[in-house]
Amino acid sequence: MTAPSAYPLKFQAGARTLLSVHRRLIRCTFDLAMARETRPPILASLDSADGYMLRSLPQSLLDGLDRSNLLVHVRQYYVRYFADFGGGFEAYMASFSGKTRATLKRKLKRFSDDADGRVEARMYRTPEEIAEFVRLAIPLSQNSYQHKLLGAGLPADAAAQNAMRTLAAADQLRAFLLFKNGRPVAYLYLPVAAGILIYAYLGYDSAEAKLSPGTVLQLEAIRMLAEEGRYTILDFTEGEGEHKRLFSTGGIACADVLMLRPTLANRLLLGAMRSFDDVIDRTKRLSGTQGFAWLKSLRR
């Protein structure tokens, strides 16, 4: 758990934050090992803090959570996906349905057909290799959908690059690039925590989106990781998505839980957040309708 600090409680639609209200919160983000726990967490004393923010709390632990008369709001429910390829790449592929395997093979072939018959992916892990990865990946990231639309591209500042080299020196990082005709078109960045690969950054050249370069690189990365055998569990972290579901071998039902002191201001804040989150959830379910088009328009 972190020390109490100002934390923005966001009213967010898609990638756009419409409003932020700050509270001093003690934060706890559950990693994959913690998410597999069967006992509710022991929360630190609030002292001067306004409350807690618990991310990736297993839903099975919600009922046993010590609420201590606090106001509780679940901001989102989701499955925390992971992939285990410790049995080798062939066993990993065999865990999928025939339809999924056919889909992946079709995407590989489509990319290969448009890249002179090759699927060229490279793994980077030493400090020297990571320096080369950064040189190639940063310009690619800045042209990616993830950077342009979501603001979630690969960090390019000096501190982030120093952290990458430090992780690589400790053998705590795996990074990948996918090339098309000698040009990088997708990147994947996986730091390691407690022996588990963390799905941190995936991006691709938006001009190549029709070739599914992110999917192709993810599959090739898992192939290389399974062959290496050093790290064989990939944590897709909090939040859902078709990409995560596609490559996962399992998942844990989790929730992001906000707990606040029962003040009038906090009651009004949580009431507004519940109403807003409900509208966003219902709008998301209207996929393909006018309501969903409204949500997408906020992301442009």
Short names for language-model regions:
Residues 38-42, 210-223:
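Conserved acetyl-CoA-binding loop-helix of GNAT-fold acetyltransferases
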Residues 182, 214, 218-221, 234, ...:
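Hydrophobic, well-ordered secondary-structure elements that form the walls
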Residues 2-16, 21, 69-90, 232-287, ...:
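Active-site/acyl-donor-binding loops of N-acyltransferases
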Residues 48-57, 225-237:
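Conserved GNAT acetyl-CoA-binding A-motif
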Residues 1-23, 57-210:
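A conserved beta-strand-loop-helix scaffold within acyl/acetyltransferase catalytic domains
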Residues 30-37, 54-60:
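Structural motif
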Residues 47, 165-166, 220-227:
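Short glycine/serine- and small hydrophobic-enriched flexible loop segments
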